[in-house]
Amino acid sequence: MFMGEYLHTIDGKGRLIVPARFREALGERFIATKGLDHCLFVYPLDEWKVLEEKLRALPFTQPEARAFVRFFFSGATECELDKQGRILLPANLREYAQLDKDAVLVGVSSRVEIWSQALWANYSRQAEDAYASAAESLVNLGI
């Protein structure tokens, strides 16, 4: 399980250090793709396979499902850790997530999210404001 928040710098070649706790759970190879809210989603291979099966089961005749699956998979790339525990983020993913120098890696249960520091700060402020009302809504779902 992934949890916590870590700030790291992306070097000039587009490499990002993955925190040691995340490296252990991700393994040597994993998948990074375009996430929601302009962050990147990073999945261990076993989690990716489960998600892939669910997405393949969506009806491709529905425009929303087709668009989501297309966008999600078009950004997906297999990543591998180097000897220093870094990953090379492709330019298209860095551009999508507006990553230039400072990145925040966030553990979100079954995945890691990679955010630009500025977008994460903005998102966190908004999420903090909505946190209490979201908790109240989740009570209705039995959580």
Swiss-Prot record:
GO MF, any single term: transcription cis-regulatory region binding
Annotated compartments: Cytoplasm, Nucleoid
Gene Ontology cellular component list: cytoplasm; nucleoid
Domain of life, per lineage: Bacteria
InterPro entries: MraZ, MraZ_C, MraZ_dom, MraZ_N, MraZ_sf, SpoVT-AbrB_dom, SpoVT-AbrB_sf
Family: Belongs to the MraZ family.
Protein's name in the database: Transcriptional regulator MraZ
Organism: Desulfitobacterium hafniense (strain DSM 10664 / DCB-2)
